């Protein structure tokens, strides 16, 4: 699937492994797991491929986050993203990663 980043700090974390923004600093273990999960997302044909990895806990979100989906980075953090279909390719999914959030805040 094609993965895009809505916020620049998410792309910087993926590419560089760090960000200069003090608000979005994460522990090195979180960043490495984030990169690993994004790479796994890129390897899948579509979001249904994420369901075969139980540890990711793929789910569609409800309530105020209606329309978004998420996969777990670890017990505390998750990647929130919006799913979309690419014109011409029905099996390819474009995931726009919107946030790396603390699941319990």
Question: Where are the predicted features?
Answer:
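Glycine-rich, flexible loop/turn motifs
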Residues: 1, 49, 57, 96, ...
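Arg/Lys-rich, positively charged N-terminal/basic patches that mediate binding to nucleic acids
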Residues: 1-38
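Amphipathic alpha-helical interface surfaces
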Residues: 6, 30, 34-37, 57, ...
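Short secondary-structure junctions and interdomain/linker hinges
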Residues: 17-20, 44-48
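Conserved phosphate-interacting/catalytic interface
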Residues: 41
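A short, surface-exposed loop/turn module that caps and links secondary-structure elements
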Residues: 45-69
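Enriched for short, Lys/Arg-rich terminal
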Residues: 68-105
């Amino acid at each position: 699937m094609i993965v895009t980043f809505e916020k620049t700090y998410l792309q910087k974390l993926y590419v560089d492994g760090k960000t200069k923004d003090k608000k979005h600093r994460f522990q090195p273990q979180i960043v490495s797991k984030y990169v690993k999960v994004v790479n796994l997302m890129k390897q899948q044909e579509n979001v249904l491929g994420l369901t075969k990895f139980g540890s990711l806990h793929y789910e569609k979100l409800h309530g105020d986050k209606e329309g978004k989906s998420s996969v777990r980075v670890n017990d505390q953090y998750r990647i929130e993203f919006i799913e979309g279909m690419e014109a011409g390719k029905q099996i390819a999914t474009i995931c726009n990663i919107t946030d790396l959030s603390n699941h319990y805040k």
